[in-house]
UniProtKB/Swiss-Prot annotation:
Positions with a binding annotation for ATP: 452, 476-487
Key words, A-Z: ATP-binding, Membrane, Mitochondrion, Mitochondrion inner membrane, Nucleotide-binding, Transit peptide, Translocase, Transmembrane, Transmembrane helix, Transport
Name the UniProt record assigns to this protein: Iron-sulfur clusters transporter atm1, mitochondrial
Cell location: Mitochondrion inner membrane
PANTHER family in UniProt: ATP-BINDING CASSETTE SUB-FAMILY B, IRON-SULFUR CLUSTERS TRANSPORTER ABCB7, MITOCHONDRIAL
InterPro entries reported in the protein's UniProt record: AAA+_ATPase, ABC1_TM_dom, ABC1_TM_sf, ABC_transporter-like_ATP-bd, ABC_transporter-like_CS, P-loop_NTPase, Type_1_exporter
Subunit-structure text: Homodimer.
Binding site for glutathione: 288-292, 351-354, 401
Amino acid sequence: MLERCPWKLISSPRNIPARSFLNSRGTYLVLRKSNILPLQHILRFSNFASKQCFPLRNGNNSASKALWNNKSKEKEPLNTSVKLASDVPDDKNVTGQMIVKDMLQYIWPKGKTNLKVRVVSALALLVAAKILNVQVPFYFKSIIDTMNTTLVQEVGALWSTVGAVVLGYGFARIFSTVFQELRNSVFAIVSQSAIRSVSSNVYQHLLNLDMNFHLSKQTGSITRAMDRGTKGISFILSSMVLHIIPITLEIAMVSGILTYKYGPSFSAIAATTVALYALFTVRTTSWRTVFRRQANAADSKASAAAIESLINYEAVKTFNNESYEMSRYEKHLSAYEKANVKVASSLAFLNSGQAIIFSTALTLMMYMGCRGIVTSNLTVGDLVMINQLVFQLSIPLNFLGSVYREMRQAFTDMEQLFSLKRINIQVKEAPDARDLVLKGGSIQFDNVHFSYNPNRPILNGCSFNIPAGAKVAFVGASGCGKSTILRLLFRFYDTDSGKILIDNQRLDQITLNSLRKAIGVVPQDTPLFNDTILYNIGYGNPKASNDEIVEAAKKAKIHDIIESFPEGYQTKVGERGLMISGGEKQRLAVSRLLLKNPEILFFDEATSALDTNTERALLRNINDLIKGSHKTSVFIAHRLRTIKDCDIIFVLEKGRVVEQGSHEQLMAKNSVYTSMWHSQESPFGESNKSGDA
């Protein structure tokens, strides 16, 4: 049995690009006022992760409001390939605040009590760990002062006093570490669940995006963006709960102790250190983000170039363009290298600046502590405690700097992933859409207008009727709209105007799942997965048994061919089916179609790439399957002799049906179809109207 994941359609809010940014003064407003208490510095700094990691849009901008309120409901026309790029939101328009807002729903998910309990438990454990952690300097002070003042006492009494303090110190250290590790373990499930949910949602959204998007984007860059984005999610989630909150709490507690125990001079140095450290980190990291974006862009281009050349390996070889492909790849790698050198150099500058700020503060505090001992205002234990508190402050500060830096990098990595989520799905189900009720499979196009490019209409008032159970064909010159009819019937695109009906039911009022389930297609170039023949045939019906798959292959007259392979149905077909012949690929497509068993069959130039003998054999096979099935079958063909026996032949010209009828009726008209027939029958493709039909 084959296993598949069910697909379902999801919707996404429209993303409206906007170019408006928060005033730079607002970015560091929290650090500008010198009289703000240290605790206010610390608590407000934690908001940088969500509000100031990226420039925000101006709240007065109408486009920005439309993005958040999703009030824009007007229907967009189908776009040109040039306009396609504008439909894909620029990743710079996705701000850190948007990403954090999206991520919060995964940290505190609705309807998942077990995950919420884990979040609360993790927060409780981190508070307990930090409370125990700040006890360590007190124990150090107590040990030093006790030993300094009780040396004249008996050794037993000294050990009794100091031993109790040492045990307390050990208890605080051990359980602080235990609580931290328990917190990490408890929160791991929340983090991994969020990564799975985000990745699944983005992938599902990509599957439901319009054909426009997939025709205009490089697969390599999309997969690379998803890979970087999921790694960024892991870091952001762990940072928000496991780093930002505990770091903020620890800085607040250490600053409060310094203020309470040693007065405003020590607290002023601590506050100034935190402020300067945060300001320097934010400014420098903002500057470094540009280099990270450049590295990501080069990385995506290199990945896309490599995947594209490997997919088209045969073309690379036949045109002897290995050196050209290598030069393309090397060009992107060179850009990636240069950007990463800038990232590394700017990181060295950031680390040096942070070390200078902290070391200066440590030196000042130690000087003040020594002076306090000389004046008998402080004890040696106080000096040790100050030293411990300052180093205790250094740990969260260093973490805060590195976490902020890594969060900015993670946000940059996640920009494109979340921009993919915000791409609008143009083809959507109506809120009151109903399942298609088939009554034979009649198809009607009523004055349909459609264009991929507004300057180049494809269908221009196209109208026709296909009776239920009929065998029909569409013919015409390349670009007249034959394959477009199939795409519109599948609702890969919506019409610009006009109606399409199946059994008198409008397509835009039918659920997409029931519509696409009712139609099967054998395309000109059959898309095959790099998997076994069994898997590829079974893709027509993921629930089919192996016996049903074999039966479909027998009906398509390919079972004996498959059995002749050394591995039979377990034979791998290779990338895009390149390891089997064209005729075998098309027979696999017919097998897949039979397994799906739809009511409407489409053959989109299914034999155009085959040799004459293979084409005739496959057509005989297809005709045998259609006879007696009472299914509506539609053929699109360039070779008119392959559709000569159709009940109705529609001749398309300039996006309209200009002639219709059987082969004999159309030949009797001696018009467009007749000219096409004689042109193909002539040895050199020249029209010969004097010949017999």
